[in-house]
C-alpha cells in the first residue's frame, strides 16, 4: 500500500513546545499574582488544548468558567507573541517531512492547539515544507481524540484510502 497522506499532531509529535507553553502560562499567572509551576508539572497539564492547560494551572478555587476564560484570553495573546522562544522541532523531524514530500506523500497537521498558534508554528518551523492542511482547535470542533478534525482533513483533501497507524 502506497501512503498518500500522513496526518501529524503538532505538540509533542513534530515540535517540543512545552518550554514556551510553560513560560507563557507562568507569565500570565505571575501577572495575576498566582502561584507558578515547574516544568514537570506543565508536562502533566498539557495535551488537551489551551483551556485545559489554563484550568489545570489555576488554583482549584479559581477554576470558574469566567476566570478560566479570562486567563485563557491573556495566555493566547501572550503566547501568540512569544510562541517560538523555546520551541524546537524534534530531532530528525524536518528531514523526515522533506523525505515524505519527496516521495509524494501529502502532509497535514491536526492539533488541539488554537488555530492561529498552529498555523504560526508550522510557518516558523517548517517554512519550506508543504502541508496540504493545517487544522488547529476551532469553535464547534471537538478536541482530539474525537476524530472530527481528522475526518475534516480527509474530506478537504478528498482522501479515500484510510489506514490508522500509530507511531
What are these regions (language model features)?
Residues 56-94:
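Metal-dependent phosphoesterase signature
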Amino acid at each position: 500500500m502506497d501512503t498518500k497522506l500522513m496526518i501529524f499532531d503538532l505538540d509533542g509529535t513534530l515540535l517540543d513546545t512545552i518550554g514556551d507553553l510553560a513560560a507563557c502560562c507562568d507569565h500570565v499567572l505571575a501577572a495575576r499574582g498566582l502561584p507558578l509551576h515547574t516544568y514537570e508539572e506543565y508536562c502533566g497539564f498539557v495535551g488537551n488544548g489551551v483551556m485545559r492547560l489554563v484550568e489545570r494551572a489555576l488554583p482549584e478555587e479559581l477554576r470558574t468558567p469566567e476566570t478560566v476564560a479570562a486567563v485563557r484570553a491573556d495566555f493566547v495573546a501572550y503566547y501568540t507573541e512569544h510562541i517560538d522562544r523555546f520551541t524546537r522541532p524534534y530531532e530528525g523531524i524536518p528531514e523526515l517531512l522533506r523525505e515524505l514530500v519527496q516521495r509524494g506523500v501529502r502532509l497535514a497537521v491536526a492539533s488541539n492547539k488554537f488555530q492561529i498558534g498552529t498555523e504560526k508554528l508550522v510557518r516558523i518551523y517548517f517554512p519550506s515544507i508543504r502541508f496540504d492542511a493545517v487544522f488547529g482547535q476551532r469553535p464547534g470542533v471537538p478536541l482530539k481524540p474525537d476524530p472530527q478534525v481528522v475526518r475534516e482533513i480527509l474530506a478537504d483533501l478528498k482522501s479515500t484510502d484510510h489506514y490508522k497507524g500509530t507511531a
